Amino acid sequence: MIALTSTSIAWLLFTVILTGWATYAFLNLRQSRDELGSEIELAANRKKYYDDEELEGSRLTRVLGIGVILMVIIVIALPLYWILEPARLTGATEAKEERFIEWGAGLFETTANGGFNCSGCHGGMNAVGGEAPFPLLDATTGSIKAVNWKAPALNTVFYKFSEEEVRYILVYGRTFSPMPPWGVEGGGPMNDQQLETLIAYMKSIQIPREDCGEGEDDSLTCPSGHLPAEDQANIDALADQAVAGGEYATRGEALFNLEFGSGSYSCARCHTPGWSWGDPGVTGQGAFGWNLTGGSTNDHFANEADMIAFIKNGSNQGQKYGTQGQGSGRMPGFGQLLTEQQIQEIVEYVRSL
Protein backbone atom coordinates (compact mmCIF):
# COMPACT_ATOMS: atom_id res chain seq x y z
CA MET A 1 0.00 0.00 0.00
CA ILE A 2 2.79 2.43 0.95
CA ALA A 3 4.66 1.51 -2.22
CA LEU A 4 1.62 2.27 -4.37
CA THR A 5 1.03 5.62 -2.60
CA SER A 6 4.67 6.65 -3.05
CA THR A 7 4.52 5.80 -6.73
CA SER A 8 1.32 7.82 -7.17
CA ILE A 9 2.85 10.88 -5.46
CA ALA A 10 5.98 10.60 -7.61
CA TRP A 11 3.93 10.48 -10.80
CA LEU A 12 1.84 13.47 -9.65
CA LEU A 13 4.95 15.57 -8.97
CA PHE A 14 6.45 14.56 -12.30
CA THR A 15 3.24 15.51 -14.11
CA VAL A 16 3.03 18.91 -12.38
CA ILE A 17 6.67 19.75 -13.16
CA LEU A 18 6.40 18.58 -16.76
CA THR A 19 3.19 20.56 -17.28
CA GLY A 20 4.82 23.68 -15.83
CA TRP A 21 7.83 23.45 -18.10
CA ALA A 22 5.66 22.76 -21.14
CA THR A 23 3.48 25.79 -20.37
CA TYR A 24 6.52 28.02 -19.89
CA ALA A 25 8.08 26.84 -23.14
CA PHE A 26 4.85 27.36 -25.06
CA LEU A 27 4.31 30.91 -23.79
CA ASN A 28 7.94 31.85 -24.29
CA LEU A 29 8.01 30.62 -27.87
CA ARG A 30 4.71 32.26 -28.69
CA GLN A 31 5.82 35.61 -27.27
CA SER A 32 9.10 35.50 -29.20
CA ARG A 33 7.37 35.47 -32.60
CA ASP A 34 4.54 37.95 -31.99
CA GLU A 35 6.03 40.86 -34.00
CA LEU A 36 8.86 41.83 -36.24
CA GLY A 37 10.99 44.94 -35.82
CA SER A 38 14.43 46.30 -35.25
CA GLU A 39 16.96 44.26 -33.33
CA ILE A 40 17.31 47.05 -30.79
CA GLU A 41 13.61 46.83 -29.92
CA LEU A 42 13.21 43.05 -29.99
CA ALA A 43 16.53 41.52 -28.87
CA ALA A 44 16.11 40.20 -25.35
CA ASN A 45 19.41 41.64 -24.17
CA ARG A 46 18.55 45.13 -25.49
CA LYS A 47 15.15 45.54 -23.92
CA LYS A 48 14.66 47.86 -20.98
CA TYR A 49 14.57 45.85 -17.74
CA TYR A 50 12.48 46.41 -14.63
CA ASP A 51 13.39 49.43 -12.55
CA ASP A 52 14.68 49.11 -8.97
CA GLU A 53 11.32 49.91 -7.41
CA GLU A 54 9.61 47.02 -9.17
CA LEU A 55 12.52 44.60 -8.76
CA GLU A 56 12.74 45.23 -5.02
CA GLY A 57 9.01 45.32 -4.51
CA SER A 58 6.29 42.83 -5.34
CA ARG A 59 8.33 40.93 -7.91
CA LEU A 60 11.16 40.26 -5.48
CA THR A 61 8.68 39.18 -2.83
CA ARG A 62 7.00 36.83 -5.30
CA VAL A 63 10.29 35.27 -6.44
CA LEU A 64 11.51 34.82 -2.88
CA GLY A 65 8.17 33.29 -1.94
CA ILE A 66 8.45 30.79 -4.76
CA GLY A 67 11.98 29.95 -3.61
CA VAL A 68 10.77 29.36 -0.05
CA ILE A 69 7.99 27.11 -1.33
CA LEU A 70 10.44 25.07 -3.43
CA MET A 71 12.83 24.82 -0.48
CA VAL A 72 10.01 23.56 1.77
CA ILE A 73 9.09 20.97 -0.86
CA ILE A 74 12.71 19.78 -1.04
CA VAL A 75 13.11 19.75 2.76
CA ILE A 76 9.97 17.64 3.13
CA ALA A 77 10.14 15.54 -0.03
CA LEU A 78 13.71 14.26 0.30
CA PRO A 79 13.32 12.94 3.88
CA LEU A 80 9.96 11.43 2.92
CA TYR A 81 11.59 9.72 -0.05
CA TRP A 82 14.38 8.44 2.20
CA ILE A 83 11.82 7.09 4.68
CA LEU A 84 9.40 5.59 2.16
CA GLU A 85 11.81 4.19 -0.43
CA PRO A 86 12.76 1.04 1.56
CA ALA A 87 9.07 0.24 1.99
CA ARG A 88 8.53 0.81 -1.73
CA LEU A 89 11.39 -1.53 -2.59
CA THR A 90 10.11 -4.17 -0.16
CA GLY A 91 6.63 -3.87 -1.61
CA ALA A 92 7.96 -4.14 -5.15
CA THR A 93 10.02 -7.22 -4.24
CA GLU A 94 7.05 -8.90 -2.57
CA ALA A 95 4.84 -8.07 -5.53
CA LYS A 96 7.41 -9.58 -7.90
CA GLU A 97 7.64 -12.76 -5.78
CA GLU A 98 3.86 -13.10 -5.68
CA ARG A 99 3.66 -12.58 -9.44
CA PHE A 100 6.40 -15.16 -10.08
CA ILE A 101 4.69 -17.68 -7.79
CA GLU A 102 1.43 -17.16 -9.67
CA TRP A 103 3.15 -17.65 -13.03
CA GLY A 104 5.06 -20.68 -11.71
CA ALA A 105 1.83 -22.24 -10.45
CA GLY A 106 0.46 -22.01 -13.98
CA LEU A 107 3.48 -23.92 -15.30
CA PHE A 108 3.23 -26.51 -12.49
CA GLU A 109 -0.43 -27.22 -13.31
CA THR A 110 -1.70 -30.27 -15.16
CA THR A 111 -1.75 -30.30 -18.95
CA ALA A 112 -5.53 -30.04 -18.88
CA ASN A 113 -5.21 -26.76 -16.97
CA GLY A 114 -2.61 -25.32 -19.34
CA GLY A 115 0.53 -26.33 -17.43
CA PHE A 116 3.43 -28.71 -18.03
CA ASN A 117 1.91 -31.43 -15.80
CA CYS A 118 4.36 -31.29 -12.87
CA SER A 119 1.38 -31.66 -10.52
CA GLY A 120 0.06 -34.58 -12.55
CA CYS A 121 3.11 -36.69 -11.70
CA HIS A 122 4.28 -35.33 -8.35
CA GLY A 123 1.05 -35.52 -6.36
CA GLY A 124 -1.02 -32.41 -6.99
CA MET A 125 -0.26 -28.73 -6.58
CA ASN A 126 1.32 -29.36 -3.16
CA ALA A 127 3.59 -32.04 -4.69
CA VAL A 128 3.25 -34.61 -1.90
CA GLY A 129 4.46 -37.44 -4.16
CA GLY A 130 2.74 -39.46 -6.85
CA GLU A 131 3.26 -41.78 -9.80
CA ALA A 132 3.92 -41.36 -13.50
CA PRO A 133 3.25 -43.97 -16.21
CA PHE A 134 6.42 -44.91 -18.06
CA PRO A 135 7.37 -47.39 -20.83
CA LEU A 136 10.38 -49.25 -19.39
CA LEU A 137 12.88 -50.69 -21.86
CA ASP A 138 14.77 -53.86 -20.89
CA ALA A 139 18.24 -53.26 -22.32
CA THR A 140 18.99 -57.00 -22.38
CA THR A 141 15.89 -58.37 -24.12
CA GLY A 142 14.70 -55.21 -25.87
CA SER A 143 11.21 -55.73 -24.47
CA ILE A 144 9.12 -52.85 -23.18
CA LYS A 145 6.71 -52.93 -20.27
CA ALA A 146 4.46 -50.25 -18.81
CA VAL A 147 5.26 -49.31 -15.22
CA ASN A 148 4.15 -46.69 -12.73
CA TRP A 149 7.25 -44.75 -11.70
CA LYS A 150 7.19 -43.20 -8.23
CA ALA A 151 7.53 -39.43 -8.67
CA PRO A 152 9.00 -38.03 -5.43
CA ALA A 153 7.41 -35.36 -3.27
CA LEU A 154 8.76 -31.91 -4.11
CA ASN A 155 7.56 -30.16 -0.95
CA THR A 156 10.94 -30.94 0.64
CA VAL A 157 13.21 -30.64 -2.41
CA PHE A 158 14.90 -27.49 -1.07
CA TYR A 159 15.64 -29.32 2.18
CA LYS A 160 17.96 -31.56 0.15
CA PHE A 161 19.19 -29.53 -2.81
CA SER A 162 20.37 -25.98 -3.40
CA GLU A 163 18.53 -23.75 -5.87
CA GLU A 164 21.33 -24.25 -8.42
CA GLU A 165 21.03 -28.04 -8.11
CA VAL A 166 17.24 -27.91 -8.49
CA ARG A 167 17.63 -25.73 -11.57
CA TYR A 168 20.09 -28.24 -13.06
CA ILE A 169 17.62 -31.08 -12.51
CA LEU A 170 14.86 -29.07 -14.15
CA VAL A 171 17.02 -28.10 -17.12
CA TYR A 172 18.39 -31.58 -17.87
CA GLY A 173 15.78 -33.83 -16.23
CA ARG A 174 16.42 -37.45 -15.29
CA THR A 175 16.54 -38.86 -18.79
CA PHE A 176 16.32 -42.52 -17.71
CA SER A 177 12.96 -41.79 -16.04
CA PRO A 178 9.63 -40.06 -16.79
CA MET A 179 11.30 -36.75 -15.81
CA PRO A 180 12.26 -35.06 -19.13
CA PRO A 181 14.53 -32.04 -19.55
CA TRP A 182 12.55 -28.83 -19.16
CA GLY A 183 15.15 -26.14 -19.83
CA VAL A 184 16.02 -24.94 -23.33
CA GLU A 185 19.68 -25.80 -22.72
CA GLY A 186 18.72 -29.41 -22.02
CA GLY A 187 16.40 -29.62 -25.01
CA GLY A 188 13.21 -28.71 -23.15
CA PRO A 189 10.56 -26.02 -23.73
CA MET A 190 11.16 -23.59 -20.82
CA ASN A 191 13.26 -20.45 -20.99
CA ASP A 192 15.22 -19.04 -18.04
CA GLN A 193 12.40 -16.84 -16.75
CA GLN A 194 9.92 -19.70 -16.84
CA LEU A 195 12.35 -21.82 -14.83
CA GLU A 196 12.78 -18.95 -12.37
CA THR A 197 9.02 -18.66 -11.85
CA LEU A 198 8.66 -22.45 -11.55
CA ILE A 199 11.36 -22.51 -8.86
CA ALA A 200 9.61 -19.63 -7.07
CA TYR A 201 6.42 -21.69 -6.95
CA MET A 202 8.25 -24.80 -5.75
CA LYS A 203 9.79 -22.76 -2.92
CA SER A 204 6.32 -21.56 -1.92
CA ILE A 205 5.05 -25.12 -1.31
CA GLN A 206 7.92 -26.28 0.89
CA ILE A 207 6.99 -27.62 4.32
CA PRO A 208 7.76 -24.76 6.77
CA ARG A 209 10.88 -25.49 8.81
CA GLU A 210 11.35 -25.38 12.55
CA ASP A 211 14.16 -23.75 14.55
CA CYS A 212 15.27 -21.27 11.91
CA GLY A 213 18.25 -19.17 12.96
CA GLU A 214 18.27 -15.52 13.93
CA GLY A 215 17.65 -13.28 10.94
CA GLU A 216 16.29 -16.17 8.82
CA ASP A 217 12.81 -14.82 8.20
CA ASP A 218 11.64 -17.29 5.54
CA SER A 219 10.68 -20.56 7.23
CA LEU A 220 10.21 -22.20 3.82
CA THR A 221 13.91 -22.06 2.92
CA CYS A 222 15.85 -21.02 6.06
CA PRO A 223 19.30 -22.72 5.95
CA SER A 224 19.48 -23.77 9.60
CA GLY A 225 15.91 -25.03 10.02
CA HIS A 226 14.78 -28.65 9.90
CA LEU A 227 11.69 -30.73 9.19
CA PRO A 228 9.02 -30.18 11.86
CA ALA A 229 9.37 -32.55 14.81
CA GLU A 230 5.88 -33.89 14.11
CA ASP A 231 6.91 -35.02 10.62
CA GLN A 232 10.16 -36.54 11.91
CA ALA A 233 8.14 -38.42 14.54
CA ASN A 234 5.86 -39.69 11.76
CA ILE A 235 8.92 -41.05 9.93
CA ASP A 236 9.94 -42.86 13.12
CA ALA A 237 6.44 -44.31 13.46
CA LEU A 238 6.45 -45.58 9.87
CA ALA A 239 9.84 -47.23 10.39
CA ASP A 240 8.72 -48.84 13.65
CA GLN A 241 5.55 -50.08 11.99
CA ALA A 242 7.52 -51.68 9.13
CA VAL A 243 9.83 -53.46 11.60
CA ALA A 244 6.95 -54.60 13.80
CA GLY A 245 5.15 -55.98 10.74
CA GLY A 246 8.19 -58.05 9.76
CA GLU A 247 8.78 -56.17 6.51
CA TYR A 248 12.28 -55.14 7.60
CA ALA A 249 14.67 -56.42 10.24
CA THR A 250 15.93 -53.09 11.58
CA ARG A 251 14.88 -49.47 11.72
CA GLY A 252 17.90 -48.58 9.59
CA GLU A 253 16.70 -50.91 6.83
CA ALA A 254 13.16 -49.53 7.11
CA LEU A 255 14.40 -45.93 6.87
CA PHE A 256 16.62 -46.84 3.90
CA ASN A 257 13.53 -48.15 2.05
CA LEU A 258 10.98 -45.64 3.34
CA GLU A 259 8.16 -45.18 0.81
CA PHE A 260 6.75 -42.03 2.42
CA GLY A 261 6.53 -39.16 -0.08
CA SER A 262 7.10 -41.62 -2.96
CA GLY A 263 10.62 -42.25 -1.72
CA SER A 264 11.56 -38.61 -1.23
CA TYR A 265 12.99 -39.43 2.21
CA SER A 266 14.61 -42.75 1.30
CA CYS A 267 17.94 -44.01 -0.01
CA ALA A 268 16.58 -47.00 -1.97
CA ARG A 269 14.97 -44.72 -4.51
CA CYS A 270 18.40 -44.03 -6.05
CA HIS A 271 20.55 -46.88 -4.74
CA THR A 272 18.32 -49.94 -5.36
CA PRO A 273 17.61 -50.98 -8.98
CA GLY A 274 13.91 -51.19 -9.81
CA TRP A 275 12.75 -49.63 -6.55
CA SER A 276 11.19 -46.63 -8.29
CA TRP A 277 8.69 -48.76 -10.24
CA GLY A 278 7.91 -51.32 -7.54
CA ASP A 279 10.22 -54.12 -8.74
CA PRO A 280 13.29 -53.78 -6.52
CA GLY A 281 16.42 -55.81 -7.13
CA VAL A 282 19.20 -56.36 -4.61
CA THR A 283 19.00 -53.66 -1.95
CA GLY A 284 21.65 -50.99 -2.40
CA GLN A 285 23.22 -52.63 -5.46
CA GLY A 286 23.22 -49.35 -7.36
CA ALA A 287 21.08 -47.51 -9.88
CA PHE A 288 21.21 -43.73 -10.26
CA GLY A 289 23.29 -43.77 -7.07
CA TRP A 290 26.37 -45.97 -6.77
CA ASN A 291 26.58 -49.52 -5.42
CA LEU A 292 26.56 -49.63 -1.61
CA THR A 293 26.99 -53.39 -1.20
CA GLY A 294 30.05 -55.53 -0.57
CA GLY A 295 31.49 -53.16 2.01
CA SER A 296 32.02 -50.41 -0.57
CA THR A 297 30.85 -47.70 1.81
CA ASN A 298 33.48 -48.80 4.33
CA ASP A 299 36.10 -48.38 1.60
CA HIS A 300 34.80 -44.95 0.62
CA PHE A 301 34.39 -43.82 4.22
CA ALA A 302 36.88 -45.45 6.55
CA ASN A 303 35.57 -43.17 9.29
CA GLU A 304 31.86 -43.59 10.09
CA ALA A 305 31.61 -39.95 11.16
CA ASP A 306 32.68 -38.84 7.67
CA MET A 307 29.89 -40.90 6.13
CA ILE A 308 27.34 -39.40 8.51
CA ALA A 309 28.51 -35.90 7.57
CA PHE A 310 28.28 -36.79 3.86
CA ILE A 311 24.70 -38.03 4.19
CA LYS A 312 23.75 -34.94 6.17
CA ASN A 313 25.30 -32.45 3.74
CA GLY A 314 25.17 -34.30 0.41
CA SER A 315 27.72 -33.82 -2.35
CA ASN A 316 28.82 -30.50 -3.82
CA GLN A 317 29.93 -30.07 -7.41
CA GLY A 318 33.66 -30.74 -7.74
CA GLN A 319 34.33 -31.09 -4.01
CA LYS A 320 36.06 -34.12 -2.52
CA TYR A 321 34.19 -36.55 -0.29
CA GLY A 322 35.24 -39.80 1.32
CA THR A 323 38.52 -41.39 0.24
CA GLN A 324 38.54 -40.72 -3.49
CA GLY A 325 35.11 -39.29 -4.25
CA GLN A 326 34.40 -36.08 -6.14
CA GLY A 327 30.97 -34.52 -5.81
CA SER A 328 28.55 -34.00 -8.67
CA GLY A 329 25.70 -32.44 -6.68
CA ARG A 330 23.49 -35.46 -7.36
CA MET A 331 23.64 -36.80 -3.78
CA PRO A 332 21.10 -34.84 -1.71
CA GLY A 333 21.71 -33.77 1.86
CA PHE A 334 19.37 -35.31 4.44
CA GLY A 335 20.52 -33.35 7.49
CA GLN A 336 17.48 -31.07 7.51
CA LEU A 337 15.01 -33.88 6.83
CA LEU A 338 16.07 -36.66 9.18
CA THR A 339 17.17 -36.65 12.81
CA GLU A 340 20.69 -37.48 13.96
CA GLN A 341 19.46 -40.85 15.23
CA GLN A 342 17.71 -41.71 11.96
CA ILE A 343 20.85 -40.94 9.94
CA GLN A 344 22.98 -42.94 12.38
CA GLU A 345 20.68 -45.95 11.99
CA ILE A 346 20.80 -45.70 8.19
CA VAL A 347 24.61 -45.53 8.23
CA GLU A 348 24.86 -48.59 10.46
CA TYR A 349 22.58 -50.51 8.09
CA VAL A 350 24.37 -49.42 4.91
CA ARG A 351 27.80 -50.28 6.31
CA SER A 352 26.51 -53.81 6.95
CA LEU A 353 25.54 -54.44 3.31
Tell me the role of every PLM-derived stretch.
Residues 125-146, 212-245, 257-258, 274-288, ...:
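Surface-exposed intrinsically disordered loops and tails
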Residues 84-175:
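Membrane-proximal soluble helical/coiled-coil segments
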